[in-house]
């Protein structure tokens, strides 16, 4: 066996992380446990477990190389690449790729005969001699993978000799390496080398093809089109103890917020504990509540001022009552609002293409399918609409999530399942406009004023997607619940199960500085902060993992939508490295 696979010394450091296996993302199909060791560079998969391990650090651009070696076992094993929407559930939806299972669009080598396999029709370069030329039968052989994400091709080799190139599917997603047991009934072990031992051949047994690099965060930073932004300059979460003083200043943000969402952590009634949303388009003292269909209200003791590093919450019971504790989630858009005429209805808009957040107001026309400019420059993946003028029956908050499509509507102020609706006139948002049916009073009542909040994915800052719950406990759920890759360390996560009545749940890393987060709030009810084991989530350096079998986040086969915003991106261009969080001993 190769010394470079078996060395006890690796170059991994906090400022330059190297690729490894990701045990939080493994697919365990049966009861026997898989195992990792040697710094997550060795995988053991028992005979009755046809399981798969993906690696960390998914790849979206650049040229990458790594090596794999068997360490005994059956000849039925797979080495290869899998899409970044890979999930721990065989039939799951994840990362917003609707209808894809974890094995769709893989390109692998079945090492029993080294024959290429792909579940993506037409994606593999045909070469009838490939299997015979690359026969692979011994654990001393080194399998080589060269992945070119710029040309979207992958090439496999053995002991320094490469076969033909394979075309990646036209799915526009990123890819990552993975290993898998080929069939039940076979026990296999795998050793991986991502070059972290250093030395000749960039740390590998065989020299990578020209231009191909080892997988580590410094190389990723150079090669991949990551976001040139600092998350804390666009999103922040702050907490404070109320004092009923209008002059009270809440600071700690690195920006002047355009949207401030305040929630009492102690109070649980609409009079004292409502979700309060303030925005710079409408100005201080004006608010709407996400847990109520009421129209916009004004209160002279509500939020007094948006400041360069925070805000003044006022002395109102719902924002700064003495003896209560509060949290505010804050976003930066584009500052001063401007008129936008991209649609056939003018909007008053503030937008940040850099952070993927905009908000705008418009006036309802009373009829017809109308378009509204949103200012993001790319398709929104989530938006919510509220009538500011009318709070009577049916003027709920309407919400769109891209994975559910234009024919589906959710309600931010309700725990219900949502359902089919023509509210968007069956028209998906575009890079410039959102279509809304003004025949619905809650979307276009003639003369009424409406507000829309829009978000889209920004690599390294925000992630909007969908996952499927595993439910139960033991192997199929609980501690082995879904892992959702974000590409950053989340500061804030909102989750809603679709298809069942369950609350919209918000968790953040400011109220819960250690894992698992066990304090959650709701958007749809003015309840006090709840704690306990039913909503455990780990906020990790590259995503989040569901730790509880509870129905609100992990119902078996449940369909869950999520939004996540970053604390720190990975890799970071600003010398900030995502770090692990302390674990609470209660979980």
Describe every region a protein language model picked out.
Residues 79:
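Active-site region of the double-stranded beta-helix
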Residues 1-63, 69-74, 83-587:
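Surface-exposed molecular-recognition determinants
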């Amino acid at each position: 066996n190769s010394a470079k696979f078996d060395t006890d010394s690796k170059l991994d450091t906090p400022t330059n992380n190297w690729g490894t296996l990701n045990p939080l993302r493994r697919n365990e199909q049966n009861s026997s446990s898989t195992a990792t060791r040697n710094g997550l560079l060795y995988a053991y998969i028992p005979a009755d477990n046809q399981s798969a391990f993906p690696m960390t650090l998914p790849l979206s651009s650049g040229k990458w190389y790594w090596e794999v070696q068997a360490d005994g076992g059956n000849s039925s094993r797979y080495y290869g690449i899998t899409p970044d929407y890979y999930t721990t559930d065989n039939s799951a939806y994840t990362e917003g790729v609707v209808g894809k299972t974890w094995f769709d669009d893989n390109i692998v080598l079945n090492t029993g005969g080294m024959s290429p396999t792909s579940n993506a029709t037409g994606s593999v370069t045909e070469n009838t001699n490939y299997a015979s030329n690359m026969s692979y039968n011994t654990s001393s052989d080194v399998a080589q993978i060269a992945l070119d994400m710029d040309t979207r091709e992958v090439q496999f080799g053995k002991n320094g000799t490469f076969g033909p190139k394979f075309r990646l599917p036209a799915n526009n997603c990123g890819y990552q390496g993975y290993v898998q047991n080929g069939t039940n009934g076979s026990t296999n072990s795998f050793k991986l080398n991502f070059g972290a031992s250093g030395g000749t051949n960039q740390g590998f047994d065989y020299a990578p093809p020209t231009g191909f690099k080892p997988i580590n965060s410094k190389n990723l930073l150079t090669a991949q089109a990551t976001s040139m932004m600092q998350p804390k300059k666009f999103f922040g979460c702050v907490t404070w103890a109320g004092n009923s003083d209008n002059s009270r200043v809440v600071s700690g943000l690195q920006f002047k917020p355009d949207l401030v969402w305040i929630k009492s952590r102690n109070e649980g009634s609409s009079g004292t504990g409502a979700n309060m949303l303030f925005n710079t388009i409408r100005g201080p003292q004006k608010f709407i509540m996400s847990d109520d269909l009421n129209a916009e209200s004004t209160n002279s003791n509500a939020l007094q001022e948006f400041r360069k590093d925070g805000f003044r919450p006022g002395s109102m019971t719902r924002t700064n009552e003495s003896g209560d504790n509060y949290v505010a989630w804050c976003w930066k858009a584009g500052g001063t609002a401007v008129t936008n005429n991209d649609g056939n209805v003018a909007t008053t808009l503030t937008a940040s293409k850099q952070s993927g957040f905009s908000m705008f107001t418009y006036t309802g026309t009373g009829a017809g399918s109308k378009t509204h400019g949103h200012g993001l420059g790319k398709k929104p993946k989530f938006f919510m609409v509220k009538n500011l003028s009318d709070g009577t029956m049916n003027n709920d908050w309407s919400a769109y999530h891209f994975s559910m499509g234009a024919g589906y509507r959710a309600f931010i102020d309700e725990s219900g399942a949502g359902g089919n609706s023509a509210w968007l006139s069956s028209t998906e948002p575009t890079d410039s406009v959102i279509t809304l049916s003004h025949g619905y009073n809650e979307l276009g009542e003639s003369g009424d004023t409406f507000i829309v909040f829009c978000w889209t994915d920004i690599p390294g800052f925000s992630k909007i997607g969908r996952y499927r719950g595993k439910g139960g406990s033991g192997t199929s759920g609980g501690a082995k619940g879904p892992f959702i890759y974000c590409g950053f360390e989340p500061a804030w996560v909102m989750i809603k199960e679709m298809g069942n009545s369950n609350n919209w749940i918000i968790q953040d890393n400011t109220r819960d500085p250690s894992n698992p987060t066990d304090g959650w709030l709701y958007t749809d009810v003015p309840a006090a902060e709840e704690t306990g084991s039913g909503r455990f989530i780990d906020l990790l350096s590259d995503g989040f993992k569901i730790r509880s079998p509870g129905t609100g986040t992990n119902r078996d086969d449940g369909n869950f939508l999520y939004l996540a915003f970053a604390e720190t991106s990975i890799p970071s261009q600003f010398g900030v490295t995502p770090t692990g969080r302390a674990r609470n001993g209660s979980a």
